[in-house]
Amino acid sequence: MPIDPKLNVVPFISVDHMMKLVLKVGIDTFLTELAAEIEKDFRRWPIFDKKPRVGSHSQDGVIELMPTSDGSLYGFKYVNGHPKNTHQGRQTVTAFGVLSDVGNGYPLLLSEMTILTALRTAATSALAAKYLARPNSKTMAIIGNGAQSEFQARAFRAILGIQKLRLFDIDTSATRKCARNLTGPGFDIVECGSVAEAVEGADVITTVTADKQFATILSDNHVGPGVHINAVGGDCPGKTEISMEVLLRSDIFVEYPPQTWIEGDIQQLPRTHPVTELWQVMTGEKTGRVGDRQITMFDSVGFAIEDFSALRYVRAKITDFEMFTELDLLADPDEPRDLYGMLLRCEKKLEPTAVG
């Protein structure tokens, strides 16, 4: 089914459509293809209009807008982060996004992005690990077994070949949930009783916790030589997971430094501390992993270009699978300068028909 060319119509991907699209494509294929699109955009990083996301912070959480443009397309995401939401039966993170034509300003796509954000976050993490983890990595510890954990596991298996998972969460029901959800894909799963137990023998350590506080999830004694740390949980000022000692021992890689200095684990460090931008590793301008004993860390906070890539990717997919609704979103008067006349014509249609 082609997308309707009518000017009032914007294709809309609902939650139901997104889930069905992911399943029709296949979760592993979706993650692998999405990672490839993210890498394409990272490799043309300099052409993008970039800025730290605009956030409204409160004691309960944060609401943010994440915009970017490559000069032809413009995309933004609305996203929140409210760690206490789960106690009220709500998601910690919800999101939606828009992709628009820069030439005329018209939206080309409106999409749910709660599920899509989980997928793009996991795809980006695994993509970073492809460059930063040891090539023979097979075991990953996941500290924090909430909504993002299964997506991380699937992405690391699809892209890096991770086979064994060591899971820990202070909420044991979350660990049981994660292990149960991942039994089908064929992982070797160990449910652990502590961070120290979870990191034993891990090639990759993923931290993906939700509490909005300065926390030390990963301490110096948890990290041995050669480990790659995938630090995902940091996403706002005042929220950290990694100890200062671990930060100082690691070679740190980030998406967009002006944003990561505000929201990532590196907010604990002086701004003079060296960090490397991930796109520069992909293009060969900077080095990533240089030895088997090197400790690498991806301080991931999420950046708008990843959402831009995700919106581009799903827009290309929806016509193949007919996974969208035509949304009457834009006013389209017969004469572009006669918007008021459009209102009057609607009023006329609503008038009761005279009976002669």
From Swiss-Prot:
Q: Gene3D superfamilies, per this entry?
A: NAD(P)-binding Rossmann-like Domain, ornithine cyclodeaminase, domain 1
Top-rank lineage group of the source organism? Bacteria
Q: What influences the activity of this protein, per its activity regulation comment?
A: Is inhibited by L-proline and L-lysine. Is not activated by small concentrations of L-arginine, and is even inhibited by about 50% at 0.5 mM L-arginine.
* Record-annotated active site: D235 (proton donor/acceptor)
Enzyme kind, highest EC tier:
lyase
State the UniProt keywords alphabetically.
Answer: Amino-acid biosynthesis, Lyase, NAD, Plasmid
Q: Which cofactors are required for activity?
A: NAD(+)
Entry's InterPro entries? NAD(P)-bd_dom_sf, ODC_Mu_crystall, ODC_N
Transmembrane parts of this sequence: none
Recorded catalytic reaction(s): these are:
L-ornithine = L-proline + NH4(+)
- Residues that coordinate or bind NAD(+): T92, R120, A147, Q148, D169, T209, V232, G233, G234, D235, K239, S300
Q: Name one Pfam family in it.
A: OCD_Mu_crystall
Q: How is this protein induced?
A: Is induced by octopine. Is part of the occ operon.
In terms of temperature dependence, the annotation states: Optimum temperature is 30-35 degrees Celsius.
Pathway participation: Amino-acid biosynthesis; L-proline biosynthesis; L-proline from L-ornithine: step 1/1
Give the EC number(s) under which this enzyme is classified. 4.3.1.12
What's the pH dependence, according to the entry?
Optimum pH is 8.0-8.5.
Kindly list the GO molecular function terms attached to this UniProt entry: ornithine cyclodeaminase activity
Q: What does this protein do?
A: Catalyzes the conversion of L-ornithine into L-proline with release of ammonia. Is involved in the utilization of octopine, a catabolic pathway that proceeds through L-arginine and L-ornithine to L-proline. Octopine is a predominant opine in plant cells transformed with Ti plasmid pTiAch5.
Q: Family per UniProt?
A: Belongs to the ornithine cyclodeaminase/mu-crystallin family.
State the protein's name. Ornithine cyclodeaminase
